[in-house]
Amino acid sequence: MKLISLFLFAFSALLFSIASFAENYTTLHNDTYSIDFNQPEKPVVLIVWASWCGYCMEEIPHLKKELKDHPEFTWLGLNVNKNPEDGRQVEVERALPWPSLSDPDLIIGDQFKVRGTPTLIVLNSKGDAVYRGRRTDDDFKAALDTLSAEQ
């Protein structure tokens, strides 16, 4: 009986954590952004970045080009700065064409098992992470092309 109770508790905790992944989030400009990471309306490219990350800044022009090549995706930044104002400043100065969610406590980042910046995560429309890594990896482009062909 204890084993069944433990199983039911663990299962309900899992369901709660999955359900809580469909939320309204706050952008760097304090706007509300709604997305269900479990079942997004279309594939998502999640760009995990920070203003102090030199590699992140180097990626921006390349990612802007990828966005032009793949407008059928939802492109979304995940800024992990402790001070969101630093992220806001970069977003404006570099004219980022995608909104960025503010995640200073890595609440979203932890759900995606983010361990550093820059990290790119590509989700299919079922919410499965089909790619996790850096843009310089050939697999990133392959993941975009594969999902694009499935659209």
Locate each region found by the language model.
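Bacterial N-terminal signal peptides that target proteins for export
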Residues: 1-8
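A short beta-strand-turn-helix
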Residues: 24-44
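Short pre-active-site segment immediately N-terminal to redox-active cysteine/selenocysteine motifs
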Residues: 41-44, 48-52, 116
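Hydrophobic beta-strand anchors of alpha/beta hydrolase catalytic cores
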Residues: 45-46, 75, 120
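Conserved redox-active cysteine motifs that mediate thiol-disulfide chemistry
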Residues: 48-65
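Conserved segment of the thioredoxin-like fold in thiol-based oxidoreductases
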Residues: 58, 65-105, 117
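Thiol/disulfide oxidoreductase modules built on the thioredoxin-like
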Residues: 92-96, 104-147
